From Swiss-Prot:
UniProt site positions, description: Involved in the stabilization of negative charge on the oxyanion by the formation of the oxyanion hole: 148-149
Protein name: Arginine biosynthesis bifunctional protein ArgJ, mitochondrial
Taxonomic source organism: Uncinocarpus reesii (strain UAMH 1704)
GO CC terms of this entry: mitochondrial matrix
Annotated keywords: Acyltransferase, Amino-acid biosynthesis, Arginine biosynthesis, Autocatalytic cleavage, Mitochondrion, Multifunctional enzyme, Transferase
Subunit structure: Heterodimer of an alpha and a beta chain.
Location of the active site: 227
Pathway: Amino-acid biosynthesis; L-arginine biosynthesis; L-ornithine and N-acetyl-L-glutamate from L-glutamate and N(2)-acetyl-L-ornithine (cyclic): step 1/1; Amino-acid biosynthesis; L-arginine biosynthesis; N(2)-acetyl-L-ornithine from L-glutamate: step 1/4
Molecular function GO terms recorded: glutamate N-acetyltransferase activity; L-glutamate N-acetyltransferase activity
Any further remark recorded for this protein: This protein may be expected to contain an N-terminal transit peptide but none has been predicted.
InterPro entries xref list: Arg_biosynth_ArgJ, ArgJ-like_dom_sf, ArgJ_beta_C
Site (Cleavage): 226-227
Domain of life assignment: Eukaryota
Length: 459
């Protein structure tokens, strides 16, 4: 039977409201609660010549200096803004950061010394707007830089430098401003990705803190850190010494636990800024209740942002969670989960609504780098967990195939959301390791549209 194709229209940058696919509108917040002392703006400067309307320059600014931390791409061809932002954070030891400037439409990657100078000039221009005299990229710079878009092209730097003062003059703390800023960092995304929430900490349960973040990404996503950008801001007081470890833990279990196409970009960056504007005692000790609480809050928040990236995967029709459980270690469970998430055969089977569990086991079986005895075939089980809360559909139990109700399997695969559970049964430790470590990974399927989008990307 012929498959009926419904194309999603992908623009260079996030389209106006009327172009957001109906299925994605529910992910765009109509309101938000934002951290004190942060203001943001999204401005059109026309980084890409074909963009004549949409905002493509984002500014995130704190009224007071922030503690800051970031996690960057592991790609050896690190883009100029990655190198410059690393340099700024190292020189300042995570202190005194005032904000972030982001352009969409050009990655400023593999652009040589000129690209580095462009990134530094973006940082210096924002500092100038803040009344600071900096050279960009040195110890006196206080603005981090991010870029996303096509690799190997120089920035239209004069357009950007001319647009920064306009963006600075339009800084605002309103929901509309945050949403427009989230739009400004997008490329092939079909919707802006913005999340905000309030929280409390054990030492001051009556004090309300805020956290807000935006992210972009729809393709070239298999972070360690892909083109994936994330900016998270909070008004909680967090010492620089604690901020990096908090972010690293959160990213490991969120942005580094998603995959769309298995590619890792030159530009990936997730930054966390904390200005302490809500008051209270700074979080500093990793053994304190405040640190433990903040770690849980930040990790859950980062997962919410990262999952939006998967939901907007290029050409995606499925949002899939793979849970590997009862593993002797978290790292081994994550290796297996990531291998399944990257498998083109698994992803295409899910697009075709085919309950082909053999592809899942095959991917698990060729996972590289596992500790000896982690994966024992006769202890391994696979099931589908429906989103409606009904009983799991068992596909394989302790290495033995189950008689599968194909009609129920087909019904489960009709839903957009699916959870695949791979139970290792404790590996060669058996019952002793049951109740052991779990890992979650989020990914999407591969469709015909993914090929179409990426075949046309530069145009």
């Amino acid at each position: 039977m012929a498959r009926v194709m419904t194309a999603q229209i992908r623009q260079y940058t996030t389209p106006i409201d009327t172009s957001v696919p109906d299925s994605k509108r529910k992910y765009i917040p109509s309101s938000g609660t934002y951290p004190r002392g942060f203001r943001v703006s999204g401005t059109h400067v026309g980084v890409k010549p074909s963009n004549t309307t949409f905002p493509d320059l984002a500014l995130i600014s704190s009224d007071e200096p922030c503690s800051a931390a970031a996690v960057f791409t592991t790609n050896r061809f690190q883009a100029a803004p990655v190198q410059v932002s690393k340099q700024i954070l190292e020189a300042r030891e995570g202190r005194g950061i005032r904000g972030v400037v982001v352009n969409a439409g050009c990655a400023n990657a593999v652009t040589g010394k000129g690209g580095l100078e462009d990134a530094k000039s973006m940082s210096a221009k924002v500092d100038e707007c803040n009344g600071l005299n900096s050279t960009g990229g040195q110890g006196d710079s206080s603005t981090l830089v991010m870029s996303t878009g096509v690799i190997g092209q120089r920035l239209p730097i004069q357009k950007i430098l001319s647009g920064i003062p306009t963006g600075y003059s339009n800084l605002s703390s309103t929901h509309a401003a945050w949403l427009k800023t989230a739009r400004a960092i997008c490329t092939t995304d079909t919707f802006p990705k913005l999340v905000s929430q309030t929280f409390t900490l054990p030492s001051s349960p009556d004090r309300t803190y805020h956290i807000a973040g935006m992210t972009k990404g729809a393709g070239m996503i298999h972070p360690n850190m892909a083109t994936l950008l994330g900016i998270i801001c909070t008004d909680a007081p967090i010492a620089p010494s604690a901020l990096q470890s908090l972010l690293t833990h959160a990213v490991s279990r969120s942005f580094n636990s998603i995959s769309i196409d298995g590619d890792t970009s030159t530009n990936d960056t997730v930054a966390l800024l904390a200005n302490g504007a809500a008051g209270g005692q700074p979080i500093s000790s990793p053994t304190s209740p405040e640190y433990t609480a903040m770690q849980s809050i930040l990790t859950g928040f980062a997962q919410s942002l990262a999952q939006l990236v998967v939901r907007d995967g290029e050409g995606a029709t499925k949002f899939v969670t793979v849970r590997v459980q009862n593993s002797p270690s978290h790292s081994d469970a994550k290796l297996i989960a990531s291998t399944i998430a990257r498998s083109p055969l698994v992803k295409t089977a899910l697009y075709g609504k085919d309950a082909n569990w053999g592809r899942i086991l095959c991917a698990a079986g060729y996972t590289q780098g596992l500790s000896p005895g982690t994966l024992v075939p006769e202890r391994t089980s696979v099931s589908f967990k429906p989103v409606d809360g009904s009983a799991e559909l068992k596909l394989v139990v302790n290495g033995e195939p189950e008689v599968v109700d194909e009609e129920r399997a087909a019904a489960i695969l009709q839903d957009e959301d699916l959870e695949i559970v791979v139970d290792l049964g404790g590996g060669n430790q058996g019952e002793a390791a049951k109740g052991g470590e779990d890992a979650l990974y989020w990914f999407c399927d591969f469709s015909h549209e993914y090929v179409t989008i990426n075949g046309d990307y530069r145009t």
